[in-house]
């Protein structure tokens, strides 16, 4: 029988006793199994997300907002409860919110090296720039006694959220990569009864001590409760003199187009939250200067698997010298030995050692060296045997590294040096990374499978699809690197392959809405997060092949893939974070960025209808939402 259970307000999912739960945008735990439905001790709890259909022009408003019509079923034995899911925001970027320092502050606002607001001079009112692209987010609880809410019925928790870029200024000109990325700490009140999160204050993190931040994309929470950020698309120091984007970045950050140093960007920032709702930041310079999308720290608290969001990218791994300390360690890059070229393909992974370093010593090199001190690069064949041909960002180059500069090359010219050392620099837009610790599996999102993965120019040659796939890694210990030395980790990837349900499907002809990839399968996966409690992999899209980008849930036991959220048309799914237990509640955090970023022909059939709706919802397309999933209601089932 089924019995509806009504609730007068949104509630979060509450954990059963002793069962940790995934970070759902609003805790998925506020509705425990009814007492009479609880089974005997030891019975397994099962979770299944139930899919919703994609929105369509039959109801245009659903295509122009964050739309959720999915459900979650929680079962024990013969008893189950199904929860309707919804979405709630903390704010839209551009909102005025309470500041942790007193007064108010602009959410997603941009600041220069002196922490002064950066004004959009094309705006009639010279308004402060604010981002339409919130991205990586971490939910952090400091524990009882460290931070207290002023409300007796609430606990104090925090979120760290970063803002990747500004799509355009008021005049409509592109601002991509021209502003220093802000990052903020949100102080949140967590209702002890429902798990509801309410924004109490916002604090912009002072990044002047790390030379500002460059294009912060995905993020993860470390096992020691810090926020691990990113700096993707590292500026090429070899060609920096002609890089207008970087000069604009430097002008906006320093007030001088030549002040910024490219070797200060492309590293891993780490944010520590303070009990007063502020944050402090440092950069780790010893983890490779690559297109950091996000990293995943393994349960040993030393091994870090890293995505590399570029063409001719690599699979990188860092093994820290000490637990919970990323300031020193050994950097490796993967070598793919193909075992299948069918579809997304499969390969065995071995590891090339690039070097060992501390962050301080690489920072000192970054402060003093130029590209010419490290490497000479030719873009046409010099017919000189002292140069080595490599693939770099989709093109052939010939490189010669300066004598004695191996360490600088490994950690500041990482892409070129990894290719020189024989690594498989062929992956295309390897983005999100996460771990399934119980099964010793990791997952990597290959947003697009094309170019250097399919053209035969490297040691990887697979078929596709362009719509991408999520690869599963087998993790183990007892491995040796290319020098024959032991890798001191039990969490080393030794193979990669894509589960059938996690491979996109290209369409030969666009469908009636304009999709060029099957809308009922993933397309161009980006954000990944895994819930140990729910045994569910969450997948957010960054797709130029779906009219609306989706958030998916994949049950690793049933192999069922379910669409659980749709972003506004033209937006991508970002800020994904799954947390199994925050004071007895679980959360799935989810943002989106650049709503109404119309592409042709993808949006040709919907733009005229949806553009006015998106503009009305999101401040003329200048704003985007930061938020989380919620429980809307519950139905009980007894067999």
Name every feature range the model reports, one short phrase each.
Residues 22-25, 34, 38-639:
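Conserved small-residue
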Residues 1-27, 34:
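N-terminal secretory signal peptides
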């Amino acid at each position: 029988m089924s019995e509806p259970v009504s609730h007068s307000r949104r509630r979060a999912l509450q954990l059963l006793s002793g069962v940790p739960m995934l970070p759902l945008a609003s805790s998925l735990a506020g509705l425990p199994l009814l007492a009479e439905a609880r089974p005997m001790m030891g019975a397994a709890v099962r979770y299944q997300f139930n899919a919703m259909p994609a929105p369509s022009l039959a109801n245009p408003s659903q295509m122009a907002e964050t739309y959720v019509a999915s459900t979650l079923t929680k079962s024990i034995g013969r008893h189950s409860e199904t929860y309707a899911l919804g979405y709630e925001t903390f704010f839209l970027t551009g909102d005025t919110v309470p500041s942790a320092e007193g007064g108010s502050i602009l959410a997603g606002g941009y600041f220069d090296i002196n922490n002064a607001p950066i004004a959009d001079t094309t705006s009639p009112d010279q308004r402060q720039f604010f981002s339409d692209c919130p991205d990586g987010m971490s939910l952090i609880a400091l524990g009882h006694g460290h931070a207290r809410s002023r409300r007796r019925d609430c606990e104090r928790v925090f979120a760290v959220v970063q803002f990747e870029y500004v799509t355009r200024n008021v005049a409509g000109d592109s601002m991509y990569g021209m502003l220093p990325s802000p990052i903020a700490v949100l102080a949140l009140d967590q209702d002890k009864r429902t798990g509801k999160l309410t924004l109490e204050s916002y604090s912009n993190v002072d990044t002047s001590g790390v030379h500002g931040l460059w294009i912060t994309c995905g993020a993860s929470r470390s096992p020691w409760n810090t926020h691990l950020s990113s700096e993707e698309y590292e500026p090429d120091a070899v060609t920096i003199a002609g890089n207008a984007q970087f000069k604009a970045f430097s002008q906006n950050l320093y007030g001088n187009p030549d002040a910024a140093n490219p070797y200060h960007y492309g590293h891993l920032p780490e944010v520590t939250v303070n009990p007063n709702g502020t944050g402090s930041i440092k950069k780790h310079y010893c983890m490779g200067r690559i297109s950091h999308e996000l990293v995943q720290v393994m349960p040993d608290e030393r091994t870090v698997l890293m995505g590399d969001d570029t063409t001719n990218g690599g699979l990188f791994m860092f093994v820290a010298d000490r637990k919970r300390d990323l300031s020193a360690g050994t950097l490796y890059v993967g070598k793919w030995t193909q075992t299948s070229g069918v579809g997304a393909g499969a390969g065995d992974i071995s590891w090339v050692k690039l070097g060992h370093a501390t962050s301080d010593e690489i920072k000192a090199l970054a402060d003093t060296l130029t590209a010419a001190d490290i490497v000479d690069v030719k873009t046409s064949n010099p017919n000189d045997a002292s140069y080595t041909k490599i693939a770099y960002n989709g093109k052939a180059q010939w490189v010669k590294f300066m004598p004695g500069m191996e360490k600088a090359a490994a950690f500041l010219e990482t892409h070129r040096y990894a290719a020189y050392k024989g690594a498989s620099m062929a992956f295309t837009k390897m983005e999100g990374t996460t771990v399934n610790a119980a099964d010793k599996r990791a997952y990597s999102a290959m947003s697009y499978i094309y170019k250097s993965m399919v053209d035969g120019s490297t040691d990887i040659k697979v078929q596709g699809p362009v719509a991408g796939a999520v690869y599963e890694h087998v993790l183990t210990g007892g491995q040796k690197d290319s020098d024959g030395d032991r890798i001191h980790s039990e969490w080393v990837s030794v193979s990669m392959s894509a589960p059938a349900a996690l491979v996109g499907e290209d369409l030969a002809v666009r469908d009636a809405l304009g999709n060029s990839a099957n809308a009922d399968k993933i397309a161009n996966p980006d954000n990944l997060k895994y819930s140990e409690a729910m045994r569910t992999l969450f997948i957010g899209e960054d797709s130029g092949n779906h009219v609306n980008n989706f958030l998916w849930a994949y049950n690793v036991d049933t192999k069922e893939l379910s669409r659980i959220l749709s972003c506004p048309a033209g937006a991508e799914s970002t800020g994904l974070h799954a947390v199994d237990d925050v004071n007895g509640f679980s959360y799935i955090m989810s943002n989106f960025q650049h709503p109404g970023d119309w592409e042709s022909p993808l949006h040709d059939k919907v733009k005229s209808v949806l553009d006015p709706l998106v503009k009305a919802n999101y401040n003329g397309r200048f704003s985007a939402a930061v938020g989380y999933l919620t429980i809307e209601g519950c139905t009980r089932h007894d067999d």
